[in-house]
Amino acid sequence: MMLNLGNFIADNVTHRAESMFAADIENNRETLSKEIEGKSLLVIGGAGSIGSSFIKAVLPFKPSKLVVVDLNENGLAELTRDLRSTEGMYVPEEYRTYTLSFADPIFERIFREEKGFDIVANFSAHKHVRSEKDKYSVQALIENNDIKAKRFLDLLSVYPPKHFFCVSTDKAANPVNIMGASKRIMEDMIMAYTSRFKVTTARFANVAFSDGYTVS
């Protein structure tokens, strides 16, 4: 029998039958519907545990279009199976996934031909301190978290979204490692674009049962 992770966490970890965010979502349902219903949505890094959870939380508010980009081809396939097989889950008719990086030329082509999206959420990043294991890993970390992120922000400026969300980390607060510093730089860059489009970012701590975490 396959483990239902949601039920396992509720029964053995949080001991809550209902999400602690359920009341907030319900109290703001009208606002969320107004912001999301009928809007086009782009999710980068949507095959990961946090990105896919975001998608499942947003879909009940009925966006008109969902495009998901991730380098994990199997993860995208699993996401699609999960969405299609979940009873009562709304999936827009215009739902597409692409196995590529947001820094790839083909991504830029997709973005420009779509003329942008109403809502853009980016969950793609090097997120582990162990990404600093050698000089090549550090270069890749900075390239992804900062240099590619800057190019992406410039691309967003061509067709500004109504709302842009980007995930960060608690390690960006008074950073003591390169990964945290790279995310702090990313945060500062994002905030420099607030005059062009609405920006929100959130600092995550370690998320139990997420991909790559010790408890998973």
Where do the PLM segments sit?
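NAD(P)H-binding glycine-rich loop region in Rossmannoid oxidoreductase-like domains
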Residues: A57-V68, R84, Y90-V91, L100-E143
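Flexible, glycine-rich beta-alpha linker
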Residues: N74, P105, A172-S182, T194-S216
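N-terminal Rossmann NAD(P)H-binding glycine-rich loop of SDR-like oxidoreductase domains
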Residues: S40-F61
